[in-house]
Amino acid sequence: FIALDLFVFYVFFEVMLIPMYFIIGIWGGANRLYAAIKFFIYTMAGSLLMLVAIVALVWRVREVTGYLTFSYDLLLTHAGAVGSLAPWLFAAFAIAFAIKVPVFPFHTWLPDAHVEAPTAGSVLLAAVMLKIGTYGFLRFAVPFFPEVALSPTVSSVIVVLALIGIIYGALVAMVQPDIKKLVAYSSVSHLGFVMLGIWGGTLQSVQGSLMIMISHGFSTGALFLLVGMVYERRHTRLIEDYGGIARVMPLFSLILTVVALSSIGLPGLNGFVGEFLVLLGSFGTYPVATVIATTGVIFAAAYLLWALQRMIFNRLDKPENEQLTDLGRRELVLMAPLLIGIVWLGLYPAPVLKRMESATRRYVQLTQPARNTNPVAVQGTSARVAP
């Protein structure tokens, strides 16, 4: 995240795969090897495309400047030197980052990786690793090739895929019998909002995307921790195997409810701020697409509240659940920072928004000329961007 050298970024983009591969492959579930290999192949394939694009970009900039450099600022300044290669280089960067996000239809590795990964692996994957994809779009793919990224055709594809991810992820989550897989598909839906906000191109929408990236780490990380805690006690992730556990695990049920409501986007909790800013900021650019995206919020409420109702508010009718113990001191200490972050970001997001304002404003200014030359991004689902 802090690399200002494209070579350093690529090296650590690849290095991230190694520990996650072993976390899933060694300490994962029954199908851990399948999930680990699938995760590795998907992300490595995208990374190799990005490597080719980096080499081509650096070589073309060298022909213009005379310097063989991976410096971010210098490459950004002279990225226009790639000329007719720009669409191909953007495609290579975009595929690599879309796999990492993941954007539909590159998402199929994520549910398997989450389900088979141990709790710590799922938390790390959701809270940190998925964000490198959306960060890559914000930091490299769009700023390097704005004329391509914000062209009507590419914008149409990205916004449509974001909408599919939002709605598809929510609908698939709604029918999941496995609580961990439900949370995994909810990530596909949430990160669709991030992509919509990035292409929304306004200060509000880009800030909203960054806020969702931060909030998703708190909320989804907390959900995976809670799923892991109850799994240690019951050794099942099937929602139907629970029911009425609020009577024997009141603290767990209270925390799970708060975290689920934050993931839904309840006002006063962290999830609301980012989604509201994305929808507010994207409406001027893509009004119809933004209205369609709001259905994802409704579906999120449906699948999470329904899961809560089945897990903690039904009758306590299974003998195995009567023996469950509530969260201990160690587990409460572990959850406390996440709960503080969830509430703090929901009630007082101003310091975070102020901290990111200069970077988001620079991104908007950097991409504004390309938006002005391509004022209509999605036929039938967009409006002109104000100059």
Residue ranges of model-derived segments:
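Predominantly late transmembrane helices and immediately cytosolic-facing juxtamembrane segments
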Residues: 104, 220-223, 290-323
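Helix-loop-helix module between adjacent transmembrane segments
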Residues: 1-4, 96, 130, 264
